């Protein structure tokens, strides 16, 4: 059920789905990890049951005027960890979601940077991922990830 996924203690040892995703519009940097099960996903078939994604949301560091700082590499400079979001998939997990907010068999959880449960309802996650439909397995940057995998 939504909200029941715990933050895996070892997720920082997992492969990165995508690293340093830049969100200048939100002044955020995101690190997205995927468990070893998720690495077995395919562009044609999506991600298998047992897949878990962990997304760390960092505030970008800002200057005195509130402008996001950019490093020598041209990327936003990571500041404090704001939130940790989880997305997990297993057979039947998504059935408890309200009608109109079902994202296949995915469930969601959100935590504050300090590890406490976040107040955001999972409906916000579901609403955001909804447009990605089954063809993208409700996962953002699906094509970007599989394009990166194919080019290796």
Residue ranges, per PLM feature:
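N-terminal low-complexity, Pro/Thr/Ser-rich intrinsically disordered segments
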Residues: 1-3
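Sequence context surrounding c-type heme c attachment/ligation sites in exported
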Residues: 5-15, 19, 23, 44, ...
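N-terminal post-signal-peptidase region of extra-cytosolic proteins
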Residues: 28-43, 67-72
